[in-house]
Amino acid sequence: MQFPSFAEYTEALQLDLSVVLSDPLLGRGTLRTRGPGLPLARSGNFALTYEVFADGRKYALRCFHKPADALDARYDAISRHLARVRSPHFVGFQFQPAGITTESGSYPIVRMEWAEGPNLAGFVADHRHDVNALQQLRVSLRRLARHLRDNGIAHGDMQPTNLVVRDATHLTLIDYDGMFVPELGPLHSAELGQRNFQHPGRRSWHF
């Protein structure tokens, strides 16, 4: 599947959200914009992420710009595994196979709860002189690593921008495109993550 360009998503999301988005909740929402009313997007390896305010809450709208093998099956497996694990380190999300309609057709989206707080890099910069906060953060990171290992989960793109720090004791992972859960064992990784935070020998079959 060929996904829309950034420009095509920008054009579509300037229209009435209830028309271009199939999700009733997001369709009632308001998109965060910049400058002359253009949708504000954060670009990742596979998706563009937009902020939508709906029913008093904030959500992430993720629109894909790059194909990934078995995208729907991956998100379905991840969702079911996280539901069983009841992990405190992930946000709720819903994969929608025809969630947005642009000029060229209908495409999948992911609606995610918004994780509030700075990312890991921002938290460390803000607390670089706070020894207690940094020590607690170290403990929390070790606890997170143990939790993932014990539950058969690998994030796949563990880097500072994908780790939200609400406070030094509460860490939340975002961006699940490259995640591994046991059910996905037969597949290769959909992405290799930010190379500066991966083993240099990692390949797609190192899932």
What kind of region is each of these model predictions?
Residues D175-F180:
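Activation of the activation-loop gatekeeper triad in protein kinase-fold domains
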Residues L187-R202:
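Conserved activation segment of eukaryotic-like protein kinases, specifically the C-terminal portion
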Residues M1-L40, D72-Y75:
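Juxta-kinase regulatory segment immediately upstream of eukaryotic protein kinase catalytic domains
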